[in-house]
Amino acid sequence: ICYIYLNFFWGDEMKFQSTRGLEKGISSAEAIVRGIAKDGGLFVPESFPNLYSKLKEEKNLSYVDLAYKIISKYFTDIKAADLKEAIKDAYEGRFDVTVNNGFMELYHGPTCAFKEAALLFLPQVMKRAKKAIGVKEEVVILTATSGDTGKAALEGFKDVDGFKVVVYYPNNGVSPIQQRQMSTQEGNNVKVFAINGNFDNAQTGVKEIFGDEEFKKSLLSKGYILSSANSINIGRLVPQIVYYFYGYFKLVEQGKINQGDEINVVVPTGNFGNILASYYAKQMGLPINKFICASNDNKVLTDFFRTGTYDKKRELILTESPSMDILVSSNLERLLYEACNRDGKIVKDLMKSLNSNGEYKVSDDMKNFTNEFYGNFANQGEVYNAIKEKYKREGYLMDTHTAVAEVVYEKYVAETGDNRPVLIASTASPYKFPRSICKALDIDVEKLNDFEVIKELNKMTGIEIPENLKDLDKKQVKHKEVWDKDEMRKALLSYLK
């Protein structure tokens, strides 16, 4: 397999370019602060440094040290000392990754979801990127969330000087625990809006605000510039590469594989950022064979990898893995860019077709390029069954999103016979979706509220409740506003007035 765009020049400056072709040679600090390119495209690094051969010689690097070695190759215009400090402030004593029986648990942090791997780091690096390019204005972080991103962004950015963070989530479209995590958020620079609509409406609304030059000018005159904490921001994507290296080295340490062995990676997928980070890790030399893309009933990606047609013209189904209830996977655009040999015009035309016709079809060459990806989906019955069986057999408790990955992985092995060692991204604590887990385990919680359900699940399984979810129901609700999906600009202005 050829690894594309390898960059053999150590210490080189890394520049970024837009997937839609308009901008090239953008510094990392600017790409991070702006979040999205002028043509609506997403920033990608102009090359991928081959780091695996170097890193495999270094034994037992801590997460913080490994993060520095990887991230520093991309964000080259932020001073080394500043970057080290950003990584330390983000992770030390706050975030941990464990690999347990092939499950890479990414939820041992303040919000109990994998998003914090990126969202504890983003505010720290953005603060320093802002300094590097001399931005004086206050940066307003706009985020649409299907559940986990919102809380992780609020937690990461709260009380960080020079920033405000505004989160939009679909009213009744996130779990009660997720909603309570956001509505009780503390901090003097945070705002949460529920919108009447689904996640795609929220994400589209945020993208439209970013694309509205007049609106942005009027904000600038008030001393504000906009940026994003969604995974469209390259400052969020790059730190996610780290845990694939870390997980791989853990498998080596545990004697599950030898250095250099190829593994498969399974990722429960919504916006395509997490699985794309594993693809980027492979471009950096990490030995990955197959990227197994697991969807719930919203199986747009499954259909895409099978047919080469991306079709969002379907009803969004609300499932028990709400963080994956998405019809437009924004980060797929970055993979398409690699698939067409970095031809921005092709990507631009595909995205235009998606916007105006609700679908696009890629060429045969591009379809063949995606053969390293396998897509499949899991329905609710399969998810419940997987949670129950795993717990019964091994005493291991998965959340609903991780269970989607487990089901799809089993389907992959059954179809292909490929049972080489695997890393399954476990993306959230089961305690974030306690009612679903109890249903799967046949624990009757019909008459209990979600916070009582947490306690019941703990009583029945003995699995510890994460510290930050323990007294969530006792916290004061601070954010109660609900706006219509067409009033997102208005909501923002009401906060920034």
Question: Positions of the model-derived regions?
Answer:
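PLP-dependent amino-acid enzyme catalytic core
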Residues: 2-497
